[in-house]
Amino acid sequence: MSDVLFIEGGRVIDPASGVDGVRTVVIRDGKVAEVAERVERPRDARAVDARNRWVTPGFVDLHVHLREPGQEYKETVATGARAAVAGGFTAVCAMPNTKPVNDCAAVTELVLARAAAAGLARVYPVGAISRGSNGEELAEYGELKASGCVALSDDGRPVMSSALMRRALEYARAFGLPLTVHEEDLHLVGKGVMHEGAAATRLGLKGIPSQAEDVMVLRDIALVELTGGRLHVAHVSTAGAVRAIREAKRRGLPVTGEVTPHHLALTDDDVGASGYSTDFKMNPPLRSAEDVRACREALADGTLDAIATDHAPHSAVEKDVEFDAAANGIVGLETAFSVCLGLVREGALTERRLVEALTVGPARVFGLPAGTLARGAAADVAVLDAAAEWTVDPARLHSKGRNTPWKGRRLAGRCTHTIVGGRIVHEEDKADR
């Protein structure tokens, strides 16, 4: 069989290369060989018929929880990678809040070995900022980088010590690593379980004020100014955080940000509308309509650089409890494109900006070799049917997690083929619609 693959007749949208039009993508030896309007295909070459579909660089997710090692009952590297390619993601960054925490080469190497064995999405480990993510002592950043980590995070836990955060930014700068941080002041969070506002009052649930996020973002931007370190703000959810990041960028500081599909599409009112469903419990919590508008505008104008899923699978035991006691987080790899395509249809995003925020935008944040269909680039490609409608059935998801707020929803937009390094690693089963 020929080692050449042709993706024919699709609308190629590649913001990194400035391409948007019907083209044929030619893949040879795992690399993009050509993107052209007219190419003659040899008789023995393989082909994907992409007519009436989008062809984009494979999506890049800066924020996923693969749970391995230590929590394989929730997810494994293999099942998470399978969910990723089903959603069009060819590269994912694995957060370090595993058991044990990824604060050393041994854990990083295990994650990479599991990813290689799965042979699906590319997995880029993120190492811990502090040993055990306990916020007391810095991890060995040189060791983490040498073993394959692309960024550092204590995700799920904020770095409460300003002194430690300062040292982390300085130390990480020496190794060229960004810090991707979970921003919340635990003293303001207290025992809150949802956004502090009228909805929380009506529901009788303890609230988390927006300022819990805002003050930490402002603190860390000040520390970036002091140290010159690179800061990436994870799962931005408030208008105040957006304003702070926008101003930091205006001043030329090395600050970037991401936003999740659920913080773009849902509000705190959805908690009550769902009947206290724990599939609507996450951290940061779903915010107000004003916050959602601010996040949408920030993504559209480039203040926020990337869409990231914060894919967080949990077992039924951890979710099928009262709202206060339930684990935070939802799965998102397989629904992200569909949910965000809804924003395009509402006029909140352009098609080009959507693709950019899922491809070259995140790739640039962590300096990953991804997000483009330029000649010579790795042939990581998503073929997408923007018109296909499907019903979200948790039992049909590839992730072990079933915790999705989109359960039973009819969504539009489906990944039909995912290609990694020139290999077709996912083809849609239309029965899943």
UniProtKB/Swiss-Prot annotation:
Cofactor detail note: Binds 2 Zn(2+) ions per subunit.
Disulfide-bonded cysteines: none
Keyword list, A-Z: Hydrolase, Metal-binding, Pyrimidine biosynthesis, Zinc
Residues forming coiled coils: none
Pfam family, one: Amidohydro_1
Enzyme class: hydrolase
Catalytic activity, EC: 3.5.2.3
List of catalytic residues: 310
UniProt pathway: Pyrimidine metabolism; UMP biosynthesis via de novo pathway; (S)-dihydroorotate from bicarbonate: step 3/3
Gene Ontology MF terms: allantoinase activity; dihydroorotase activity; zinc ion binding
Binding site for Zn(2+) 1: 63, 65, 155, 310
Catalysis performed (reactions): (S)-dihydroorotate + H2O = N-carbamoyl-L-aspartate + H(+)
BP terms from Gene Ontology: 'de novo' UMP biosynthetic process; purine nucleobase catabolic process
Residues holding Zn(2+) 2: 155, 182, 235
One GO cellular component, as annotated: cytoplasm
Chain sites annotated for binding substrate: 65-67, 97, 283, 314
Cofactor: Zn(2+)
Stored NCBIfam families: pyrC_multi
Family to which this protein belongs: Belongs to the metallo-dependent hydrolases superfamily. DHOase family. Class I DHOase subfamily.
Protein name in UniProt: Dihydroorotase
Species: Anaeromyxobacter dehalogenans (strain 2CP-1 / ATCC BAA-258)
Gene behind this protein: pyrC
